[in-house]
Structures are given as structure tokens and as C-alpha cells.
Design a protein with these regions (language model features):
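N-terminal small-domain helix-loop-helix segment of the aminotransferase-like
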Residues: 2-6, 10-100, 107
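Conserved core of the PLP fold type I
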Residues: 64-188
């Protein structure tokens, strides 16, 4: 199936967080200029037809009450984990549902740490991670990313190791591609 990645959508005036308001700064572009929303992981291409079809089918039911996740939801995750990561024995009861990345991060942080625990996060960092740690009462310990001689962002493994040991850290957040620098981490 081919997808449309070339149509430019004008999302201004449609409650688009990426285009209608630039948070954190209070600054709006001067008249005649546009902002490029590099601060948010929001895609501006047309949604894939199967996604639109599924949403439209769901909207045919005029009630949006609570729903149960279908078997296909769990099967797709189990198959993806098996094929992509070699995970065997994953069961539906091992899979949770989250509405977004930050909800998932919050659930994981609250499941494996306690308020006051220190969490390792690379900086620069996505402000959503910062707010989630603050909201859950965790303490951020930053490990600064370093640029190599080619200008590529790299993790500083010595710094990470030292901070993990010195701060008795048992939980770290890795973001790939890294937000905000866009670096996709290699598998070693």
C-alpha cells in the first residue's frame, strides 16, 4: 500500500497544537511568517487510509462509551514483539493500554520506582519527560549527550555509568529517536 507523504495540509485554525500555539515561549511568528513546529513530534502528512477507515467505522456507532480491546490488538503486539525483538511467551495479560507515550512513561515510572527515586535522562531532553518526572515526584539526573567530531550526538557511557552508580539509579529513560535532537540510537 502506498501512502501520501507529499500533500501539505494547512492545519492552522483547527486547534493544532503544532501550528496554532507555540507553547513555553509566549512568542508568535511575525505576520507573514510561519513557525516550523520542530518542538513537537507531530506529523503533518495525511493519515494512512486504513487508519481513517477504522476511525470512520467506529464513528458509525453513535455512542462512545467504554470499549474492550479486541484480540487483534493483543495479537498484533505479540507478533510484533516476537518478530522484531525475539520475545517469546508474551501474553495479553502482560500488555497494558496507554493513550500516549507520556502515559506509558508515567505508568512504567510508577510501576518500577518510588517517589523521590532518581531517574537517569539524557539532556537535552523532551520537556514532556521533565514534566512527567516532576508530576510523579521523581528526581531527574541528567547525562548530557555529547557531539562527536562529525557533529553526531552520542551518549557519554562513562558519565552514565558514574551517575548510575553514584546516585543508586535503577531506572533510565531512553528515547529513540532522541527528542529533541532526532538522533536514532544504534544497536551495539
Amino acid at each position: 500500500m502506498k501512502y501520501d507523504f507529499t500533500t501539505v495540509l494547512d492545519r492552522r485554525g483547527r486547534d493544532s497544537l503544532a501550528f496554532d500555539k507555540i507553547p513555553f515561549t509566549g512568542v508568535q511568528p511575525d505576520e507573514g511568517f510561519d513557525a516550523i513546529p520542530m518542538w513537537i513530534a507531530d506529523m503533518s502528512f495525511v493519515a494512512a487510509p486504513p487508519a481513517m477507515e477504522a476511525i470512520l467505522k467506529r464513528m458509525e456507532m453513535p455512542n462512545f462509551g467504554y470499549f474492550a480491546l479486541p484480540d487483534e490488538y493483543f495479537d498484533s503486539i505479540i507478533n510484533w514483539q516476537r518478530k522484531r525483538n525475539g520475545v517469546e511467551g508474551l501474553l495479553p495479560e502482560n500488555i497494558g493500554y496507554e493513550n500516549g507515550v507520556l502515559g506509558g512513561v508515567s505508568s512504567a515510572v510508577q510501576s518500577f520506582t518510588s517517589p523521590g527515586d532518581k531517574i537517569l535522562i539524557h539532556s537535552p531532553t523532551y520537556v514532556g519527560f521533565t514534566h512527567t518526572m516532576d508530576d510523579t515526584g521523581r528526581v531527574i539526573v541528567h547525562s548530557e549527550l555529547q557531539r562527536d567530531e562529525q557533529g553526531i550526538w552520542r551518549m557519554d557511557y562513562e558519565d552514565m555509568d558514574r551517575k548510575l552508580k553514584e546516585n543508586n539509579i535503577h531506572f533510565a529513560i531512553f528515547c529513540s529517536p532522541h527528542n529533541p535532537c532526532g538522533r536514532v540510537w544504534e544497536r551495539w
